[in-house]
Amino acid sequence: MVDQEISSKLLSEVHFRQVRQSDLLALEWEGEFVHFRRMYADAYRRSQLGEAVLWVVDHPQLGILGQLFVHLDSPRHELADGVYRAYIYGFRVRSPYRSLGLGTRLLQLAEQDLVKRGFAWSVLNVSRENLDARRLYERSGYRVVAGDPGRWSYLDEHGIRHDVNEPAWRMEKRLIP
């Protein structure tokens, strides 16, 4: 765990910003998420079309420490409808830098951006097994509104389809009273 002195210095040095095309490989975290390469490229393409917003926590020496993606619209309108509801996904902070406030600040930044865009609701799914993330979301004002089967698929970096079964809780937060 990063000690308190390093933590304060780290927080003063990070930048919260939108993803640039040059960040795409860095989102793979030295190969840990290489299997999401095509998803990252598609998310970036969607961001260029104004359909998504991709955020990172960037440190000048350490690189990308966290990421959070937002779909502004989706075929699943209970998640994102392009007008009132936006869907947060792909939210992660590197393990050594968790519990330092980076995730909370990144989530707040994304929510503030959604309010500026006129969205009233933020929606996300959290794995039923990820209790730490659920606690973060609850502290941030999200509440469980439904279960979600968590079935989705992706093509890995080799074009091989992977089916994921990750039961989740759908959580929502009202951004505009």
Task: State the predicted function of each range.
Residues 52, 119-121:
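Short secondary-structure junction motifs
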Residues 17, 125-127:
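Surface-exposed loop and edge beta-strand positions of immunoglobulin-like domains
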Residues 100, 122-123:
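A generic secondary-structure micro-motif detector
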Residues 3, 9-14, 18-95, 104-109, ...:
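Acetyl-CoA-dependent GNAT
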Residues 120, 127-131, 139-146, 150-177:
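C-terminal "cap" of GNAT-fold acetyltransferases
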Residues 90, 94-108, 115-117, 128-135, ...:
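Conserved glycine-rich acetyl-CoA-binding loop
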